[in-house]
């Protein structure tokens, strides 16, 4: 377990004072290491010099969506709960905004699952869910919707206390705007109402919590193995997801998930109600999480030490080669001017240790919708809520991705190719013998073309469905208007 000796044990950091905020951040903090990536920026571990307290600092490039960043800071400033990550202050440094937050030494729940390569037990899930519900109860009382609840956004400190984090897509719910109409969140955790853009309120977080409970129990959310585009169509139309092997879980846990995953928001339980559920009320204290936290932190430390040993070994080998090369000068044969050739074997960045841990969440990211004049690649930002899209705006994201895939797939022309991959169609007769005559490069290009083709077919099906559905909706609306006139 990580311990930090405070230089001034009588004083704990609560908020950065005015004097600290007028200084350069390096004068106030010692940045120790990079922890990972959050919404809109990188997160670092640092020490507050005056108190010795460990903090987390999110460094966000100023060219990122400043409106979203300011919203995140505003929401964190307003929150004061032991179940929500605390905010201490922020700085502008060169082209970055530094956001100073509470440090949770054990990392996220998804980090722990990944490091241990084990899912959680019911007891462990109940304890985490209880703290998460208390955090949601507080946020919802403050009329705020988190909108991105998942295991990757539930952080644990070394004592086992769970806290909600990453407010990059959180929203304020005002009395004049009882429901929101923007598609924001991470696809597989989205509530049906969020996907359909029919308006949603705080209980959208409850659906995401139910999906997160399944994620903690099974290691990944439902539909994680299929294309996100298909999942987005399946979530609103299919029955609520359940455990793959229900017999492995207690009736109380199964019922809790069932209460979270009610498709109708009006019938879905609230955070206050779920805190009284038998599964949650039976939860044990945070101390039961310490063993798994210690195990995960030990694994992480051993991996870091192993990586450092490898880097040190590479440095030694490179240093030996560099010394050998630098001590040998070779005169070019027959060249009277004496050309000296020097071989540089030192690789750039040999002393930099970067951890690349691929997780489901990092691959998925967070979906936020673009306004029409934005062209941010790979990240979708929030749509202006005053606009009335003619169709679900999340489709714009996949259409943009399809275009990018087509550019990446077909933009590189190879000499000798007689047929463009974009002209290729999947054989309808099932005869694929001709594939044997193609090169590996050609086969790879054809394979990369399949996803855009599939998305195009799905879009065509969606349009046909909409063309049949809309007249029915219009007829229903017309009948309602006639009834109102009587």
From Swiss-Prot:
Designated name of the protein: Serine/threonine-protein kinase 4
Cellular component per GO, a single term: nucleus
Family: Belongs to the protein kinase superfamily. STE Ser/Thr protein kinase family. STE20 subfamily.
Keywords, ordered alphabetically: Apoptosis, ATP-binding, Coiled coil, Cytoplasm, Kinase, Magnesium, Metal-binding, Nucleotide-binding, Nucleus, Phosphoprotein, Serine/threonine-protein kinase, Transferase
Region (Disordered): 305-332
Binding partners and assembly: Homodimer; mediated via the coiled-coil region.
GO terms classed as biological process: apoptotic process; hippo signaling; intracellular signal transduction; negative regulation of canonical Wnt signaling pathway; positive regulation of apoptotic process; protein tetramerization; regulation of MAPK cascade
Site (Cleavage): 325-326
